[in-house]
Amino acid sequence: MSKECKICGKKPMVGNNVSHAHNVNKRRFNPNLQRVKALFDGQVRRIDVCTSCIKAGKVVKAPTMGQGKVTSAS
């Protein structure tokens, strides 16, 4: 699984851990990715999407089995 958002292309960034003694170690800041069943390129697929794209509404989630059924009120 690549650590990249399929919607916005957000990838890991490189930064530093800095201690009180100012010892510096390299580290990676990974995006908060979630595997979501969504409509992507006209198909329902599981894609890795960052939470900022989910919150912004850039992802169209796939309909579940219960959605879309019409029940009669008789």
UniProtKB/Swiss-Prot annotation:
GO terms for molecular function: structural constituent of ribosome. SUPFAM superfamilies: L28p-like. It holds the Pfam family Ribosomal_L28. One of its GO terms (cellular component) is ribonucleoprotein complex. One of its GO terms (biological process) is translation. InterPro entries: Bacterial_rp_bL28, Ribosomal_bL28, Ribosomal_bL28/bL31-like_sf, Ribosomal_bL28_bact-type, Ribosomal_bL28_sf. Keywords: Ribonucleoprotein, Ribosomal protein. NCBIfam families: L28 (TIGR00009). PANTHER family: 50S RIBOSOMAL PROTEIN L28, LARGE RIBOSOMAL SUBUNIT PROTEIN BL28A. Belongs to the bacterial ribosomal protein bL28 family. This is Large ribosomal subunit protein bL28. It comes from Desulforapulum autotrophicum (strain ATCC 43914 / DSM 3382 / VKM B-1955 / HRM2) (Desulfobacterium autotrophicum).
